């Protein structure tokens, strides 16, 4: 993927506020502090397109970004992080319906990158997100982040455990490191496959 330009479009909560359905979309979902912002910044080759926060759960809106590139252009959609205990209950209650409306109704959505920390076994919230994607027939792209923080043996062991928890084959999981940028091209290839295969 050769990127010409990446720009922030807008933030939204309700479908009426989403940008027009002009380009295919790939959304990014994951628990708070799983490395979602860092992943997006690395794949679009921008240091601070998506701000990383030391306060988990701070992102409470759906953020839309447009990527103009070759061989295709698309929107990247940053969904709110989930699963952080200190977020106020009323905010948590807004997140579920907000994300479910987007996942179920967005016509241009071609796939969702579900981001997991390779050091952690997927939580109930992770499984709920994956089940949402499956029920809405959205293509999941599973990316395991922070791979530079584990040894080769730990990586193999954790990959097997995560795959078993998700009831997926290990070959379906993408390893990624924001530090070394390993996995960037693989993530883009998975995104391109989703955009091309699920095009109307």
From Swiss-Prot:
Per the UniProt entry, the signal peptide is none
InterPro entries (UniProt xref): G_ENGB_dom, GTP-bd, GTP-bd_ribosome_bio_YsxC, P-loop_NTPase, Small_GTP-bd
Keywords for this entry?
Cell cycle, Cell division, GTP-binding, Magnesium, Metal-binding, Nucleotide-binding, Septation
CDD domains the UniProt entry points to: YihA_EngB
| Gene this protein is translated from | engB
Native source species: Trichlorobacter lovleyi (strain ATCC BAA-1151 / DSM 17278 / SZ)
The source's domain of life comes to Bacteria
EngB-type G domain sequence ranges: 22-197
What is the protein's given name? Probable GTP-binding protein EngB
Its cofactor is:
Mg(2+)
Q: Which residues bind Mg(2+)?
A: 37, 59
Q: Which residues bind GTP?
A: 30-37, 57-61, 78-81, 145-148, 176-178
Heme in keyword set: no
Any single biological process term in GO: division septum assembly
Output one GO MF annotation: GTP binding
Role of this protein: Necessary for normal cell division and for the maintenance of normal septation.
Can you cite an annotated GO cellular component?
cytosol
Q: Which family does it belong to?
A: Belongs to the TRAFAC class TrmE-Era-EngA-EngB-Septin-like GTPase superfamily. EngB GTPase family.
> What PANTHER family does the record tag this protein with?
ENGB-TYPE G DOMAIN-CONTAINING PROTEIN, MSS1/TRME-RELATED GTP-BINDING PROTEIN
């Amino acid at each position: 993927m050769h990127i010409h330009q990446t720009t922030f479009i807008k933030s939204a909560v309700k479908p009426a506020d989403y940008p027009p359905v002009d380009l295919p979309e790939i959304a990014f979902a994951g628990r708070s502090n799983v490395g979602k912002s860092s992943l997006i910044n690395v794949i679009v080759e921008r240091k601070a397109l998506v701000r990383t926060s030391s306060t988990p759960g701070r992102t409470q809106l759906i953020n839309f970004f447009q990527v103009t590139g070759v061989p295709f252009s698309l929107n990247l959609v940053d969904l709110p992080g989930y699963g952080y205990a200190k977020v106020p209950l009323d905010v948590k209650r807004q997140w579920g319906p907000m994300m479910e409306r987007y996942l179920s109704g967005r016509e241009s959505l071609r796939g969702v990158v579900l981001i997991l920390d390779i050091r952690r076994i997927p939580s109930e919230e992770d499984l709920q997100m994956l089940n949402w994607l499956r029920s809405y027939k959205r293509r999941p792209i599973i990316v395991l982040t922070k791979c530079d923080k584990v040894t080769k043996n730990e990586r193999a062991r954790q990959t097997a455990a995560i795959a078993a928890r998700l009831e997926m084959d290990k070959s379906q999981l993408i390893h990624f490191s924001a530090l070394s940028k390993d996995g960037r091209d693989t993530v883009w290839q998975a995104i391109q496959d989703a955009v091309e295969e699920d095009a109307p």
